[in-house]
Amino acid sequence: REMIAELNVGHAYYLSGGWSMFGGGEQEPDRDAVGFLGVDWIYENEHWTVEKVVQPEPGFRAQHHPLEDAEARVQAGDRLLAVDGRPLSADRSPWAALVGTVGLGVEATFERDGNTFDILVTPIDSEAELRHDAWIDANRRQVHKATDGRVGYIYVRNTGIEGQTDLVSQFFAEMHREALIIDERWNGGGQIPTRFIELLNRQPVSWWARRHGDDWRSPSDGHFGP
């Protein structure tokens, strides 16, 4: 690890604990993981309260939201009273109550406007994808608002498989706009982005002018710039 740091080596695939992503080495010891429900919590008036449900647009969401299958819709302002019958307190936060619950069904008791209700929910081990997608949605809304809908926004997290999925899944919803912003900040690298170039650099090859109806050009799945 010291040599990798001194030489500034990239793509070494050596992680903490001596574990390699290609096998070998010792993995980190098992721990009871904290479960997450995809919400922002705030402690106020002696209760743990949902400040916001992290909810990206379904069409662009990569991760299943743990509250999506709940019979009752949890919303901002709801108070979490207990998990599996054990009450929460100032000293027992939602994170403490959800230790060791990842992938397991738990009963969460909420209160809204003086009425309590229980839901069955399966906590997830990370909210990273949900929060990442919500951030993308916020950026897209900001671009649409600032340009009166004339400019589209696409974020790609890397130039690997995930980034290619990002590009294609967002491209077709934004391609009708006059121009596109392709945001690649903090991208994780990957492959030479030939597929990106092929899609974004497509040129029109034919035009259709019908006697009745609108004219159009092909390929239909290309963006030809403003």
PLM region descriptions:
Residues 1, 20, 31-35, 39-44, ...:
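Beta-propeller domains
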Residues 1-2, 13-22, 110, 209-214:
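Short coil/turn segments at secondary-structure boundaries
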Residues 1-4, 8, 151, 181-182:
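GHKL-family ATPase ATP-binding module
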Residues 3-6, 53, 199:
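Generic structural signal for bulky hydrophobic/aromatic residues embedded
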Residues 5-13, 202, 206:
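A structural signal for alpha-helix termini and helix-coil/disorder junctions
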